[in-house]
Amino acid sequence: MASSLIFLLLVTLTFSASTLISAKSNTTTIIESTCKTTNYYKFCVSALKSDPRSPTADTKGLASIMVGVGMTNATSTANYIAGNLSATVKDTVLKKVLQDCSEKYALAADSLRLTIQDLDDEAYDYASMHVLAAQDYPNVCRNIFRRVKGLAYPVEIRRREASLRRICGVVSGILDRLVE
């Protein structure tokens, strides 16, 4: 009797462990295969694996997670520019440029919010269009700086722009996979 219970316990534990390993492997496989369609594989895998929703997400869910990362980036950049830079600047031209840049990042966040709605509606063409718009708004900010003689594009804004561009690139790659 005792040996039957031990055998049953061992079979149950073995089955449970193999199920957990299989589920983890399947999650890793879906993230990795999804990220292979992007231009930023390592970044994509790292970002998705760090989100607790990823293990249960399908490809569309992974796209939504990355869009959320982009919305956070764009919103925090808009707030950073508006709060940290604009508030301390006395130069009216620079202040106006920073306000314009803050608005562009807010528009990028709005475009990404629309992308979430497009994903829910499975309107992937519109989702792609909104992601491209979100990716382009920071370029407008950089161009505003270029047009004003003597203004240097701040390093932190440049870094955040590159980050948003990378995030949007990942989302675009995932959207391409959804269209296939």
Swiss-Prot record:
It comes from the Eukaryota. Its main location: other. SUPFAM superfamilies: Plant invertase/pectin methylesterase inhibitor (SSF101148). One of its GO terms (molecular function) is enzyme inhibitor activity. InterPro entries: Invertase/methylesterase_inhib (IPR035513), Pectinesterase_inhib_dom (IPR006501). Mostly expressed at low levels in seedlings, stems, leaves and flowers (in all organs), and, to a lower extent, in roots and siliques. Disulfide bonds join C35-C44, C101-C141. It is found in: Vacuole. Keywords: Disulfide bond, Glycoprotein, Signal, Vacuole. Residues 1-23 form the signal peptide. GO terms for biological process: negative regulation of catalytic activity. Gene3D superfamilies: Invertase/pectin methylesterase inhibitor family protein. GO terms for cellular component: vacuole. Glycans are attached at N26, N73, N84. Inhibits fructosidases from both cell wall (cell wall invertase CWI) and vacuoles (vacuolar invertase VI). Belongs to the PMEI family. This is Cell wall / vacuolar inhibitor of fructosidase 2.
